[in-house]
Amino acid sequence: SAYGSEKGIHDLHNQGFPLVMVNRFQPEDVGKIETISVDNYHAGYDATRYLIRTGHKRIAFAYGREELIFYRERYRGYCDALKDAGLPYDEHLVMRETSGAECFYHLTRALMELPQPPDAIFASSDPKAFVIMHALHDLGKRIPADVSVLGFDNVAMASMVEPPLSTMAQPFREIGATAAKSVIRQIRYKEEHGVLPPANSYVMAYDLIIRRSTN
């Protein structure tokens, strides 16, 4: 869970409980506790590069809770992609979560009132993208003619909203299967050796799903 207790997880691990951390972990956890994630940095980079390649110059970013490493890594990829393309970083184009995904409704409306509003918005999760699209619709903005919107996750609703959401897909089924196999491996190893095995770190593939919310 993205909202679990890291201290509780580390306490369980120190007591010898088999577990795996999915997406939410710190760099120092790698090699100590089993971890699974997509390459969030390169996914954020590639998402931003896609928007740049399709002609966008003013790309906003919807940032999630900054204490969560996967949001930080997606943001870092966004920043580096802008830099490598020679586009200026503009703090005014970064919307920061204050009270859950619903806060992005008002943040998006404020964003579009800028003298130079964005021509694309990269949301660090699909739920944020849905709220952003709602705000843009209410403002009379056309997606993607006026503003392209790109999400992250590829949750089921992404293909059902109007227009269907372009997004960076995480392989949720494979992540779940890998997590289950990891726990089983740890249980069997501990039964045989009395301790947990050396920790593995699994980095899963991501995929850009292009739908009609981007040009």
Regions found by a protein language model. Give the residues of each.
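Bacterial carbohydrate/catabolite-sensing allosteric modules
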Residues: 6-215
